[in-house]
A protein has these predicted regions:
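N-terminal beta-loop-helix "entrance" segment that forms/cooperates
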Residues: 55-80
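Walker A (P-loop) phosphate-binding motif
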Residues: 2-44
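Inter-motif core of Ras-like GTPase G domains
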Residues: 114-135
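Beta-strand-loop-alpha "switch" segments that mediate conformational coupling across diverse proteins
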Residues: 167-209
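Switch II (G3) loop of P-loop NTPases
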Residues: 48, 95-117
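Short beta-strand-centered segment that lines the nucleotide-binding/catalytic pocket of NTP-utilizing
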Residues: 40-61
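Conserved C-terminal guanine-recognition region of P-loop GTPase G domains, centered on the G4
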Residues: 139-159, 166-167
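C-terminal boundary of histidine-terminating zinc-finger modules
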Residues: 202-222
C-alpha cells in the first residue's frame, strides 16, 4: 500500500502534547501514531516527560524505543527524555523538524506547578486529552480546562484541546454517553477512538514491539485526523 499522505503542516510544523490519567493509553497511542506518521511521510520527534518512576528512570515511551532492535527504524521517530519544565517549549522548538511534529508524552494528569503539565500546555499548539469513557472523565475535562485558563491568564497562550476516547470495549454504550457529556460541556471529541484490544497483536500487548501498520485501522484514522486538527 502507498501510505503517502499530503503533508498539511506549515514549514514551522506543530507541537502536540498528550495528557490524561495514568493508564489512559497515552504512550501506547503515541508509539503507534509516530509509526503511522513515518509511513505517511510526516517527520516527527517525541519527548518523554513521564518521570513518574523518578527523574533517572525512563518513561514508558522512551523505554519502549530503547527496547527495539538497533537495526530497525524503531518507532519511526527519535524519542528524547524531556528536559525540566521551564525548558520544554524551547526544546520542542529546537528539535521540531520542518513541516513536522514535536510531540510530548506526559505522566498521569496532575496540575501541580512543578511538573510538566502546565509546561506542556504552554508549549503546545494542540493538546490531546486521552480519556477512558467513565463518569469521572467529565470531571477530568473540567480540570484540564481550568489549567488552560490558568496558563492563558499567565502567558496569553491557549492551545486547541481535543478529547480522545481510549481503552473501552466496542459495543458498550458508555463511550457514546461520555462523548455526549463532553460535547455538551463544549469540548471537542475526536471522531477516531482507540478501543481496548487485549489480543496478542492488539494495542494493549504491543509494548516493546515495533507497532504494526494496518490501513484504515483506528490508529490510522487517528493519525490522519490529528494532522487535520493540528492545522486548524
Amino acid at each position: 500500500m502507498d501510505w503517502t499522505w499530503k503533508n498539511p503542516l506549515p514549514e514551522e510544523g506543530r507541537k502536540i502534547s498528550f495528557v490524561g490519567k495514568g493508564g489512559s493509553a497515552k504512550s501506547t497511542t503515541l508509539a503507534h501514531l509516530v509509526r503511522y506518521w513515518k509511513a505517511m511521510g510526516i517527520p516527527a520527534v517525541a519527548h518523554d516527560a513521564d518521570d513518574s518512576d523518578g527523574p533517572e528512570e525512563p518513561g514508558s515511551l522512551l523505554a519502549w524505543a530503547e527496547m527495539l532492535p538497533v537495526h530497525s527504524d524503531g518507532l519511526g521517530a527519535p524519542v528524547y527524555r524531556a528536559p525540566a519544565a521551564p525548558s520544554l517549549r524551547a526544546e520542542m522548538d529546537r528539535l521540531r523538524p520542518p513541516h513536522g511534529l514535536s510531540l510530548v508524552d506526559t505522566k498521569a494528569w496532575d496540575r501541580g506547578k512543578h511538573n510538566s503539565h502546565l509546561a506542556a500546555i504552554r508549549a503546545s499548539d494542540l493538546l490531546v486529552l486521552a480519556l477512558y469513557p467513565s463518569g469521572m472523565e467529565k470531571w477530568r475535562g473540567a480540570s484540564i480546562l481550568g489549567a488552560m485558563d490558568e496558563v492563558e491568564s499567565m502567558s496569553g497562550h491557549r492551545p486547541r484541546v481535543v478529547c480522545l476516547l481510549t481503552r473501552f470495549k466496542k459495543g458498550v454504550g458508555a463511550a457514546g454517553e461520555v462523548r455526549k457529556e463532553l460535547e455538551n460541556e463544549g469540548l471537542y471529541v475526536l471522531k477516531a477512538e482507540i478501543p481496548a484490544n487485549e489480543s496478542k497483536t492488539g494495542y494493549s500487548q504491543s509494548f516493546g514491539t515495533v507497532p504494526r501498520l494496518k490501513a484504515n485501522s483506528d490508529m490510522h484514522e487517528l493519525a490522519k485526523e490529528l494532522l487535520v486538527e493540528a492545522t486548524r
